[in-house]
């Protein structure tokens, strides 16, 4: 590999912070100011090295051309019914943003209802959340620009898709819940702050409030319905009960699956919604999660993990809400995790379980909880569902590593409940029958069995020669289920690659127990699980360290960076997207404080001692052995990422280049690409997605000497 000349970067050796008696040097703290001329110059100097490096990768053009060709397939969501009309999202293939269509009936002509593509020249304005009024006649929708979490809410009259003048600003992480009379909507916003709020700022997000907006009035007249002045981190999202009588307020403090649950009986608000609501504190602790399903009068059905880490379904009668009086409707499964529930056709419950990282879909009786039917499903994931209490039909969407998507429709008024294929998509150019998916269970360091999916061409020899791409996440109770990825299948097809996805601890694959096994004091388990996945792939002959790439984003960016520090000998290439790299300071920026539920916080001495051991920024060291260097590393971030602010990646790359990059033995590149008009990933336009994956796989090909197979 050619040796790269990294920029000379100023180190402020006087920037030292004391953590519980430990002096920690932070020489690149000046990179925390995104607006300083110095930071802008740093970003420009880094991009000046990285962009040509990526553009000179021999296969980049071939990869981008193939990606553009194969990604050009139709993408549909499930149909969903609102009032008397049906709606669905559709992307013809390469549109930057998907378009919302409306139909008067399932057989009727489809018309464009909302096309976000016309809101910007480059596709960087995206739809972020929407809500229809109960009768389906009004539509509220959130827009975000350049990938930021900040949202502007606008309104439309559905008939004729007529734009209304109402606009709501300073909205972020918000609910959108209409009262059933269609007069207005609950939403969340943050107080005004100094400086800008466009997604390039790093200021912390505290004191979120709940407001009610009356349609046709100015935002300045909105009614404050809930606030928590003594609890700045609390966030309270509202939803209306199915009968429209109750407002349910779900209060969260971080990212743990726990919430308080308060409610207000709107019939008790004699003057309507006119101020802080009369909240009844049904659950006033953070000891479990309560997810509203439906209610019959005062008997409310919830999905909960209270004393049931795999979740169960319970009934609570608001007239007699003592925990000892709760009734179990569907008990917790000993192994499978209940992911979500919906009530449909007034007396049915649809339950979706996760069984060894594969979905199961069931129909139960709302009154007795009894199982009525299990829907037939291949091995894969349910990625879409629609069907509410007043509907008599459901739609659900299935996908897997080798199937882009099948949408099923089931009419629940029929005697025999047989789902039919409503729509099936194929991708021309990738023949699924040439490939196979296997799921294996490998032992981690402490003996725990970890599931991993492996996708490869049929009939390959396990001789250690294949390039492999290992992906992981491992945090925040999020399960990584099979999904269809054209970019990764191109790697398998045209780069002779092996795709592996490791379902490490910290995720939700086996419920709250699995999540707790990879957070706080147990965070090292995530890194051990992932390193053992790599060792399994090598031992079984799928790949070898020099041919192995690891990849993750956000919490997964932290994962792959920590693994590179701990085992630089185990990987050939590391691609860390929008990663959390400074574990001592993450809680100070934007919404970082919410992640302390998974990571802890350096303000605590005990937590500091966990964090400083694995924080990527604080554990970069030149490997001692002469024949070991750091893998090739590419960090990806963006100027409008206000979820994981770019300073994490900027400080980490400066540290890598200084400590490792100056060494003679480090011939593998250590690079960063900072994108513009992009954020953490939600709403990213197709054109940017194609550029990003072309960069990633071109980097892999160049660094690991992978040839293109036509």
Curated annotation (Swiss-Prot):
Keywords: Acetylation, Cytoplasm, Hydrolase, Protease, Serine protease
Pfam families tied to this protein: Peptidase_S9 (PF00326), Peptidase_S9_N (PF02897)
Reaction it catalyzes: Hydrolysis of Pro-|-Xaa >> Ala-|-Xaa in oligopeptides
GO biological process, one term: angiotensin maturation
Gene Ontology CC terms: cytoplasm; cytosol; extracellular region; membrane; nucleus
Residues modified to N-acetylmethionine: 1
Residue numbers annotated as active site: 554 (charge relay system), 641 (charge relay system), 680 (charge relay system)
Post-translational changes noted in the entry: The N-terminus is blocked.
Subcellular location: Cytoplasm
E.C. no: 3.4.21.26
The family this protein is said to belong to: Belongs to the peptidase S9A family.
PANTHER family: PROLYL ENDOPEPTIDASE
Protein's job: Cleaves peptide bonds on the C-terminal side of prolyl residues within peptides that are up to approximately 30 amino acids long.
Subunit structure: Monomer.
Name of protein: Prolyl endopeptidase
Lineage of producing organism: Eukaryota, Metazoa, Chordata, Craniata, Vertebrata
